[in-house]
């Protein structure tokens, strides 16, 4: 396919049009008075959102060169979303400001490679200062503030703060769509895995269709049990203790399952069989996790252990086990706290080492089941459109909260960027020429988020930026109430990780943009060109066309 090539100024101008098209659509959403953007969907109702990355991903421009510019800035948003989970609009606003400011200087004859050096130096200094002014997040109230600012909803803030308090930092919080109108929090205490009873005859509560075992013994094996003789010796020991038994095995079938069911119906003893969770190597790891939580020994031939010789001392214990059709929940397992701590440490190391997102997610789930718990935020709304928009906002709020716990918080509303300008200005004393121009580009761009928040609130951005430069550190502009307040005191805060990631990613793409000297794209198809040439009929058939 033929290609079109644009060089230097012409290339950068074409790409800038794409940058502006995308950034202008995204930046209307920033701040407490930011507006929404409506996205067309091929099927179903349109999506209404104020999530920067969702809007950026939707934009596809007709002109190939403009589209490349738009895609570069979309990359800033998606990278920030990947690292911090929020701050995508801020990153887009910063990128646009750096690109526009930088382009003026490159057009005027500045050396883009030296400008790039200045941009990188300024961003490094800004990030150091952000780390220095970040405050660790403490208490449920502070967590609620971060989530409420991100979602622009105090109720959501309280919900996420409660979820994090209940399941801990290592717990898993998932967001699901609910069929009702209200948004609720559902917390699963104890360790839960997605396998239910082997037979419905094992249930003890017919109303809830659950098998509830109080103070049961727990047998864990990676073998398939089809003959009752294999577990008879340990079964007799458990019956003597007059306690129920939970069997977690690769499978329980045939005569073994029939015997367990018959004895349950007769009232001789109460045993519930459950298939082992997971598959392959992950199954073995999950069985080991359950063994550690319950204080059981995993009966496996790899360790030379035989089911027939299992003793009651090798079984685990828990205060309660609830088995439904699809899930098994073990509450207050009898595992030793030192063993659990060691296992948690081992899983954390694996999370750091893995390069696969899927593996990381599964390891995170295992960590949550061992160390914390699982909380489910069930999002409700009146219409499907509102439900999707609300779900996106809650996901952003959850990501922002996690980021805040990791690296602390800074003043929100674009204020932190204004506060780091003094530190960035200090390097101008030792920087000259085009490198100093690069530093000045970053200084100007750092004002852009606050300027845009003010403009979305109907104020003059430049006036507010100038005033804040002369205010004490921590003072900022509350666009929701049109007042100047102490941002952290008022609870208007941003996670330091989100602020840092937005700045670093914006600078990275802007520097690449400014150093672009040629752009190559596919030549558009001529209008009205035939899709396929006329075949003129097939040989010997007199021309079918």
Curated annotation (Swiss-Prot):
Organism field: Exiguobacterium sibiricum (strain DSM 17290 / CCUG 55495 / CIP 109462 / JCM 13490 / 255-15)
Gene Ontology annotations of biological process type: protein refolding
Assigned keywords, A-Z: ATP-binding, Chaperone, Cytoplasm, Isomerase, Nucleotide-binding
Coarse class of the protein's main subcellular location: cytoplasm
Localization, UniProt: Cytoplasm
Reaction catalyzed: ATP + H2O + a folded polypeptide = ADP + phosphate + an unfolded polypeptide
SUPFAM superfamilies in UniProt: GroEL apical domain-like (SSF52029), GroEL equatorial domain-like (SSF48592), GroEL-intermediate domain like (SSF54849)
Name of the protein in its database record: Chaperonin GroEL
Family designation: Belongs to the chaperonin (HSP60) family.
Assigned GO CC terms: cytoplasm
Functional description taken from the UniProt entry: Together with its co-chaperonin GroES, plays an essential role in assisting protein folding. The GroEL-GroES system forms a nano-cage that allows encapsulation of the non-native substrate proteins and provides a physical environment optimized to promote and accelerate protein folding.
InterPro entries for this protein: Chaperonin_Cpn60_CS, Cpn60/GroEL, Cpn60/GroEL/TCP-1, GroEL-like_apical_dom_sf, GROEL-like_equatorial_sf, TCP-1-like_intermed_sf
Annotated EC: 5.6.1.7
Recorded GO MF terms: ATP binding; ATP-dependent protein folding chaperone; isomerase activity; unfolded protein binding
Pfam families named among the record's database cross-references: Cpn60_TCP1 (PF00118)
PANTHER family per record: 60 KDA HEAT SHOCK PROTEIN, MITOCHONDRIAL
Subunit structure, interactors included: Forms a cylinder of 14 subunits composed of two heptameric rings stacked back-to-back. Interacts with the co-chaperonin GroES.
Keyword set includes Cytoplasm: yes
Chain positions recorded as ATP binding sites: 29-32, 86-90, 413, 478-480, 494
Keyword set includes Cytoplasm: yes
